[in-house]
Amino acid sequence: GKTGKYLKYAIGEIILVVIGILLALQINTWNENRIDSKRLNLYTQSLLNDLELDKKRLIECMVFDSTKVSIIDRLSDPVQDFIEDLSDRGILTIKSIKVNNATFKTMSSNNDLELYQNIDLQNSISKYYADVEYVIRFENVYINNSYSNFVEFVTRNRGHTLEGLKGYLSFMKSASENEFDWYKELIGLNESITKKLKDQLKK
């Protein structure tokens, strides 16, 4: 009778409401995924730009260190203008690495690295910037202080024999060679991440 009709009507209404809720949830999920995908693409493009600039600077640092090592190797017997010669050749200067990590910091602070479903890519990006930080700390704490001490030593001992300078030159050569190797490794990691990010944009 009427009760049965009302019951069927009520059940029908409930089913329609449930369907409506499910559709709304599906649309909401689709919108969230679309927004995440758009944000991820923006992050990816920004990271690619950062990595491209980083690579150029890393190459510049490699050339600088390679040139310095070559000059040190060619230095021969003491000459009167040896100190001035060192300054003219740029041996008393250093070139520190500078990278663009703004995009990475933003992604890290928002936990947005997880937007990349590729765990290997997440780890590679994190390792790259961690390695960069290590090199920067080494340069700031160790090399810069040693170079400053060397410059001070040279300034105060212009009439000194070159024997006292050989240790510093040896350190400079070793430090420059180490930096060269680190920069080379960073470039390799940079190129690997760049390839993965470009593949990500194709998806």
Where are these regions (language model features)?
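Long, hydrophobic alpha-helical segments that serve as membrane-spanning/inserting helices
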Residues: 1-8, 29-203
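Hydrophobic membrane-insertion alpha-helices, especially the h-region
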Residues: 11-26
